[in-house]
Structures are given as structure tokens and as C-alpha cells.
């Protein structure tokens, strides 16, 4: 999995510039040659900050096969209510079976072990990147209230 932050590391690598340790990202130069290391990341973390009715604020992870997103921004903006939303806090997709993300399989019992694993990975990614929302009680309350929801 390659993330946007990896491009600056790649460019620095090709330019022969030492990449600052305090910056996120890893050069994927060897990946381009077909030499992906075994310790290369398995999941990419992302964050969507906007709080729109059709796509509220959320964060998630994506791997080769699965994608999991938590919609913490339900009802934050535009005076809309949670009942107006198109989803209920979680989206989960099996990208192998549903590459267009048309079927939210979050409630599907056959994926519950995978979802539990991905939730743990999502928390680890947030901590690793320092994206913990410690300064937002509103987001923390949403996480606390709906993290274990089974809608």
C-alpha cells in the first residue's frame, strides 16, 4: 500500500537527499523495482475532514482486500440528523468481491473477525500517526458512543 506521504520520500530518495526522520512517508523505490520488503505496510490510513450530509467526516484504513471506515461526523454540520444519513457510522467492504464498494458488509456475520482485526489496526494507525483527536471532545464522544456499534 502506497500513501500520498510516500511520494516526498521517494522524490528525496531519487534526488539523493536524506529524508527527515520527523516526516511521515517511506520511499517506495524498491517497490517500483518489484522488491517490496516483507515489513512494508499492509494498510493505508486516511482521513476525510469535511462534514457534509452525503459524506460526513470519517477516518479509515484500506488493505489489499478490505476497507473499513468510521463516520464520526454524523450530524456535525448542516443541521442534519443522524437519521438522515445514508449509513450508520461504519462502512466495510470486501474489495475482492465488491471492488466498486456497492455493498456495505459491516453487518455480515462472516466478516466479524476481520472487522474486529481491522478496528484494532485502525486504532493502532491513528496512534502511530498521532491522529487521536485528543483536542476534540465532540469526536471523542462520537468514537466512544459508536465505536462498537453493530447497526
Model-derived features with residue positions:
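Short amphipathic alpha-helical coiled-coil/interface segments
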Residues: 118-122
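C-terminal cap/loop subdomain of S1 sulfatases and analogous C-terminal strand-loop tails that border
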Residues: 4-8, 13-91, 95, 113, ...
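Carboxylate-dense, calcium-coordinating segments in secreted/extracellular and ER-lumen proteins
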Residues: 101-105
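Catalytic nucleophile-loop/oxyanion-hole region of alpha/beta-hydrolase
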Residues: 1
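Intrinsically disordered, low-complexity polar regions and short flexible loop motifs
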Residues: 98
Amino acid at each position: 500500500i502506497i500513501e500520498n506521504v510516500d511520494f516526498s520520500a521517494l522524490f528525496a530518495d531519487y534526488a539523493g537527499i536524506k529524508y527527515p526522520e520527523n516526516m511521515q512517508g517511506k520511499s517506495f523505490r524498491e517497490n517500483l523495482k518489484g522488491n517490496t520488503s516483507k515489513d512494508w505496510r499492509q494498510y493505508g490510513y486516511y482521513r476525510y475532514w469535511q462534514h457534509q450530509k452525503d459524506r460526513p467526516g470519517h477516518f479509515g484504513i484500506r488493505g489489499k482486500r478490505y476497507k473499513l471506515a468510521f463516520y464520526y461526523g454524523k450530524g456535525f454540520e448542516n443541521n442534519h440528523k443522524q437519521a438522515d444519513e445514508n449509513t450508520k457510522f461504519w462502512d466495510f467492504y470486501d474489495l475482492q468481491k465488491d471492488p466498486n464498494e456497492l455493498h456495505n458488509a459491516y453487518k455480515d456475520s462472516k466478516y466479524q473477525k476481520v472487522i474486529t482485526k481491522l478496528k484494532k489496526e485502525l486504532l493502532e494507525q491513528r496512534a502511530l500517526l498521532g491522529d487521536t483527536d485528543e483536542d476534540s471532545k465532540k469526536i471523542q464522544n462520537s468514537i466512544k458512543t459508536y465505536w462498537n456499534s453493530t447497526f
